[in-house]
Each structure stands twice: as C-alpha cells, then as structure tokens.
Amino acid sequence: MRCFVYVLVCVVASVSYSRAQLPGAGGPGVFPGGVPTIGPVIPDPTRTETCAKFWVQEGDSCYLFDSGAFLRQVAASRPVVVNNQDGLFQAAANMYCGQMHPNATLVTVNSLAENNFLYEWAVRMMVEPEPVWIGLHVGPAGLWQWYSGEPVTYTNWEGMVAPRAELGLGAMIFDADIIAQMFNNQVEITPQWVPEHGRNDRHSLICEYHPSGMTAAATNAPTTPPMATAPPMAATTRSPVMFQNNPGNLVNRLTGGRFGGSLLHEIPRRQRMRPSNYRKNPYFGIQP
C-alpha cells in the first residue's frame, strides 16, 4: 500500500511539473522572470550588428520573417494565449511590421535576385508550406504600389501577366500546391506572386526596413507600375506534361528555374486558361 501511495505521489508531481513547463500553464513565477512575451523589438544602442535583433541583413535591407502571432493575457487570473496564430490580413500585417521596427513595412521586392533570396531564406525556415504577404497592393488611386512608397520597377506575377488592379487586392508569395509523383507526393512552393484580396485570408509576412544611411528615403506617392518582368520565354509547341503518365521523376531533373525554385510550375487552381482542370482531371497539369 505504501508503495502504491508513493508511486501515485510521484505521478502527480511529474504531471504538475510538466504542466508548469507549458506556456500559459500558470501565472507569473512559473517561468524564471515571469511569462515570456513577443512584442516590438526595442532598439538596443549597444548592439553592434547593423540590423535589429531577430532581423537578418542582406544587401542594404534588414528582413524579418514573422507569423504575426503574439502573446497576451486576457486577465491576471487567466493563462497567456497566442493571438493571430493563423497570421494577419495584409493591411494589419503592414501595421505589424511598423510595430516591430520604426519605418519597417511589408517587404518591397525590387529584383529577381532579391525575390530568389527571400524564397530560399524563408522556405528553409518553413515547417510546412505557408503563403506570405509582400507589400504590393492596390492603393486608393487604383494602382499597384508598395507600402514602402518605392516605385514599382519589378514584378514576378505567376503566369507573367499582371492582374487587373482592383481595390482590396494584395500580393502574396510562396503559394503551394501538391504535386502527385510516382512514389510520393511533394509540394511545389512557387516563388512567383499570386494576387489575393487583402482581407480574404490571414498569412505570415516578411517585413523590411533600410538601416539609416544605407538608402535614400522612399517617396510616398503612388506610382503607375511599369510591370517589368523577366524576358518573355521563347515560343514552344510542347504540350503540358501529364506527370503521372511520365515514367521519369521530372522534379529531380528539372531544378533551378528562371523564376527560382523548380522548372516545373504547376498550373494554380485559381488561374484561368489552364491546360488541365485541377479539380476534375485525375492528372495534374504541369507547365514546364
């Protein structure tokens, strides 16, 4: 009997200790120094790095890849909970960037090199595919513009066709679709941009700011985008590859496409004029 009581006491103590390690499992004092919080990064004057804490420098910019989530406590007697675990709408995401660092906005992508850097940097950190807001959106004047105010000199729209500027539209990157293969299913994460209404869904985000003295101040006037894209591809008569009918593993052979990522670009469900119907056709239409 004594042995049973001893074991029971040990089990209860172990469960209590485990609960104490969980965020929000108790009030202040459970964690050394109180409950951890995720809030704006306060500039540290003693910091020697160019970018603020948690930000990464590439070229003349500092970037932050963020889920948009933060911790809050509804009441002193209630546990700490995570807000916005599914991300933020685009306008809220841009405001969030400004809270994370002065003068920061959703990222402005000015070149293919910058686009490819963001693709490789962010995708390496993803546990699962996650669409991400960038700063391109349709402003009050009905024109595509960046939240930073910089002119639109480069775009990388999926399909190489700029979508019609409609109020409320924004741009996201890293849209993903499942690609059916012979031995397993893989996910194609596109480095090209996809239009999405800013309040349709919540996404993660990439923020950007330029350290003082590294770039000229941006202008805030909306600009009419030239919609520059990569040079047009040569005309081809090849028909779309039906991947499940092809005996070869094409994804392992076709890597490093002109837009970054794979040379295989799956026709997205939302895109018109696709060679095969994603929902009705048992085979996925693949556009080499």
UniProtKB/Swiss-Prot annotation:
Query: What tissue expression does the UniProt record report for this protein?
Result: Spines and tube feet.
Annotated signal sequence is 1-20
Superkingdom in the source lineage: Eukaryota
Keywords from the named record: Glycoprotein, Signal
Residues listed as glycosylation sites in the UniProt record: 103
Instruction: Report domain C-type lectin positions.
Output: 93-163
Disulfide bond annotation, renumbered to this chain? none
SUPFAM superfamilies reported for this sequence: C-type lectin-like
Q: What does this protein do?
A: Matrix protein of the sea urchin embryo spicule. The function of the matrix proteins is to direct crystal growth in certain orientations and inhibit growth in others.
The molecule here is called 30 kDa spicule matrix protein
Origin species, per record, is Hemicentrotus pulcherrimus (Sea urchin)
Upper classification of the source organism reads:
Eukaryota, Metazoa, Echinodermata, Eleutherozoa, Echinozoa
